[in-house]
Amino acid sequence: QQNSYYIAEHYLSMGYHVLTPDLRASGLSGGRYLTLGYRESEDIVLWAKRVAEFYPQAKIVLHGVSMGAATVMMAAGREDLPSEVVAAVEDCGYTNADELIAMQMENSFGLPAFPAMNLLNWRCEKVAGFNLHDAAPIDAVRHARVPILFIHGTKDTLVPPNMAEQLYAAANAPKKELLMIPGAVHAAASQADQQTYFRTIRKFVQPYMEEQK
């Protein structure tokens, strides 16, 4: 959440209002289980709709980091995304959860993807009611309804940089841009090169925030 506040401060400095909700099963939000962005994307859409109810002239930019980025990408591809959402910024999100977890199992614990992933998926379905295959931002961005800015650090060892390239290539957004931050590790691009990070965001989102409805 500290990272969220750091980023929020920069949006505030651009003159925007900021809402930083905790995702389900995190912080002050309810729920028992994370779904790696799958059901969280439903929550974000509901938050956006709620904002639009109170502020009919609102223009909303979704910004997420890591799992938040996966959530934002999946929200961007949802048919029920409200028209008040005009752009999205994803920072170090993954292509799909099952591929990422399988890779980390092998790299960090030396476990083969099979049968470990089958067992994990069975457990997720039984306990949390979702399939890891459902958490697939790369499928969502193929149906993106808003412009997306993709950001990733070149030294990210948790979510490999090539995932950002795959997401960018797959995205069928009205507009898209890819920013790679040299030397940045996972979820630290905004600190590694603050000037480039926020300058690029401002340049990307500003035209959509200033458009007349």
Describe every region a protein language model picked out:
Residues P137, V146, P160-A169:
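Short alpha-helix in the alpha/beta-hydrolase fold that links the catalytic acid
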Residues A192-K213:
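Catalytic active-site module of serine/aspartate enzymes centered on a nucleophile-bearing elbow/loop
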Residues Q1-H10:
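The serine-hydrolase catalytic nucleophile loop
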Residues L34-Y55:
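Alpha/beta-hydrolase active-site loop
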Residues H143-R145, F150-H152, D156:
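Short beta-strand/loop motif that positions the catalytic acidic residue
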Residues K155-V159, A187-A188:
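Acidic catalytic loop of the alpha/beta-hydrolase fold
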Residues A169-A187, Q194:
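Catalytic histidine neighborhood in serine/cysteine hydrolases
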Residues M74-F130, D139:
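Hydrolase active-site cap/lid region
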